[in-house]
Amino acid sequence: NEYQNRYRAVFPIKVNQQRLVVEEVFRAGANFGFGLEVGSKPELLVVMSLTQNDDRPIICNGFKDDSYIQAVVLAMKLGRKIIPVIENFMELQLLLKHAKEHGVRPQLGVRVKLSSEGAGRWRDSGGDKSKFGLFITEVLEVVHQLKQADLLDCLKLVHCHIGSQLQDIRRVKEAVTELAHIYAELYKLGAGLEYLDIGGGLGVDYDGSRTNYDSSMNYTLVEYASDVVYRIANVLNSRKVPHPEIISESGRAMAAHHSVLVFNVLGASVLDQFKVDATPPEVELPQPCLLYTSDA
């Protein structure tokens, strides 16, 4: 696809918080600059002990209260490559407040509610009816506030979450195309964008059927990657916008195969305990009532 930038994966530690798993995934991605994603202040503190390399990104999602935002800003002051993703205006105000107090020019991202919906069991976590993220009009208000604070160049990332365990590749194509158009528009408005975060959703073919069912997916990993890269490049080339780094948060696909649960079958229930004969027993059945009329 001749894409003119790189790809990074970030591992959401909420997928599996076991220390051995997180450390192994983080170590395996060292040569590729892979990072970690956190959804709370405690997770951020855990990740801080791992990310000694300033080039490994930390993406901060989830609801962010005052203490969470303050921890993020202090991590920035230590030189960590940390990007809080803004999901409401309160988070933006807290970030601007603490950044001013500590003399930090913060890097930040915005999570966008797309009109494109996911599919399957977690479809409500994406789309414009999702409880997370900002509508397009709200994103424009964030841009306006950052511009007033002379921090528009600090808007580095655009993020969306389509859904989890996406079994239909068409949903991915639609969402990525829409997100790329939003990225291009924000770039044209003067934002200092560098990253496009497509969130999670990469499925796992649990039953091996390669079908459009909740426990499977109708695409391969190669097809997923090709479609994502092609759609982003195609949109941005048409808008004459530089290619960003692509980030994904495919925690399920990264960790699902690391272990298998094996257990003994203790019992089973059957449905054919009681049998009904096909022919009823010979009993005296009610006879039809016939009415006769006579010509008198």
Describe every region a protein language model picked out:
Residues 166-174, 205-223, 253-268:
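Short glycine/threonine-rich loop-to-helix capping motif typified by GTGT followed
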Residues 243, 269, 273-281:
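Catalytic or ion-translocation cores adjacent to nucleophile or general acid/base/metal-coordination motifs
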Residues 292-296:
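Conserved small/polar residues in nucleotide/adenosyl-binding loops
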